[in-house]
């Protein structure tokens, strides 16, 4: 069985290009280490503001965090991208990863 990893990546205030570049670099790093990366970037229509509102979601950031934690349950490793300490969701993901014994990796220079 291939070990699975997830990314914890700050996105607030970043352009789509910045997010994609960081994400691609992190995925390449994890794949070169032999991990299968579980997608935690939720971009399809189901997660759009209108769709969430229609379903009664009143706190989208919390919904994204909940889905991320669900995906984390599939993983052995959590990889934290630079700037994670400044992002509320990433800090929560880090605390959960520590509490539940996931292996924690950091983007170079950001422990």
How does the language model describe each region?
Residues 1-111:
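Conserved catalytic or regulatory cores that recognize and/or transform ribose-phosphate-containing ligands
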């Amino acid at each position: 069985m291939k070990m699975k990893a997830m990314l914890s990546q700050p996105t607030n205030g970043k352009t789509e290009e910045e997010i994609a570049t960081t994400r691609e670099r992190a995925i390449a790093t994890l794949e070169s280490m032999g991990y299968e990366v579980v997608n935690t970037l939720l971009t399809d229509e189901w997660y759009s503001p209108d769709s969430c509102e229609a379903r009664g979601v009143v706190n989208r950031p919390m919904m994204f965090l909940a889905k991320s934690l669900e995906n984390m349950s599939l993983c052995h490793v959590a990889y934290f991208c630079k700037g994670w300490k400044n992002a509320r969701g990433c800090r929560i993901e880090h605390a959960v990863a520590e509490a539940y014994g996931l292996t924690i990796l950091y983007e170079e220079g950001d422990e």
